[in-house]
Amino acid sequence: MAAAAADKSTKERLLSTLDDLEVLSRELIEMLALSRSQKLPPPGEDTLILELLIQRDKEFQELMQTALEQGRVHQEMQSLEKEVEKRDSDIQQLQKQLKEAEHILATAVYQAKEKLKSIDKARKGSISSKEIIKYAHRISASNAVCAPLNWVPGDPRRPYPTDLEMRSGMLGNMSNMSTNGVNGHLPGDALAAGRLPDVLTPQYPWQSTDVSMGILPPHHGNDFGLEPPGHNKENEDDVEAMSTDSSSSSSDSD
């Protein structure tokens, strides 16, 4: 009997005790009703019913205390469940942040490895600055940085004046202009014909004819002259320096 009662829940035990109390109370009320109608019940029956009623009431009070205790435990369990849910949410948030940090760290590690590979590759194929400077000098000695407008790739001519072209050009002949003209003036017949003197005539195709046309105005007289520079010695030195640089570049390229 005790084992069967232990298997029942507190709610079932409370309901069973309430049913017993209800039955005993009804019997006790019926006995009181019979005593008023002068129909006495068997002797000792009322005492037995009262004892059972008191016993069931005691059991009911004990069950009520158990139920209250279980209610407090249930409330604690609910509060603990809420706390667990909160902690679980915090753990999930931390897990998400850890996943993001892991992704960032993995990306950083991958980029660092790639940089290390690039550094190792650069170290294996490194070139000293001296070699780069020598190569730049070799390029500058064999190639020009600019060319006349009529020069195209594949042209056998060099895109810059050589030593011979510098000496036979306008700058090289400026020192001889005073000897070819009268008192430093250009020859009158050349000016009258609307052309430059032979000393100023372009000797090579890369020399633009627009330069010569820009020097002579459309209307000129026989007395128009181009005054030579005041210091022929300085001009000769400049031409000599330019010729020396050009010849050195030509020799390097050859």
Curated annotation (Swiss-Prot):
Classification via InterPro entries: Mediator_Med4
Subcellular location: Nucleus
A GO BP annotation: regulation of transcription by RNA polymerase II
Biased composition, class Low complexity, residue ranges: 243-254
Transmembrane segments: none
Keyword annotations: Activator, Coiled coil, Nucleus, Transcription, Transcription regulation
A GO term from the CC aspect: core mediator complex
Region (Disordered), start-end ranges: 215-254
Major location category of this protein: nucleus
Coiled coil: 72-114
One Pfam short name: Med4
GO MF annotation: an example: transcription coregulator activity
Quaternary organization: Component of the Mediator complex.
Family the entry assigns: Belongs to the Mediator complex subunit 4 family.
Biological role: Component of the Mediator complex, a coactivator involved in the regulated transcription of nearly all RNA polymerase II-dependent genes. Mediator functions as a bridge to convey information from gene-specific regulatory proteins to the basal RNA polymerase II transcription machinery. Mediator is recruited to promoters by direct interactions with regulatory proteins and serves as a scaffold for the assembly of a functional preinitiation complex with RNA polymerase II and the general transcription factors.
PANTHER family in the cross-refs: MEDIATOR OF RNA POLYMERASE II TRANSCRIPTION SUBUNIT 4 (PTHR13208:SF2)
Protein name as catalogued: Mediator of RNA polymerase II transcription subunit 4
The species this protein was found in: Danio rerio (Zebrafish)
Taxonomic lineage of the native organism: Eukaryota, Metazoa, Chordata, Craniata, Vertebrata
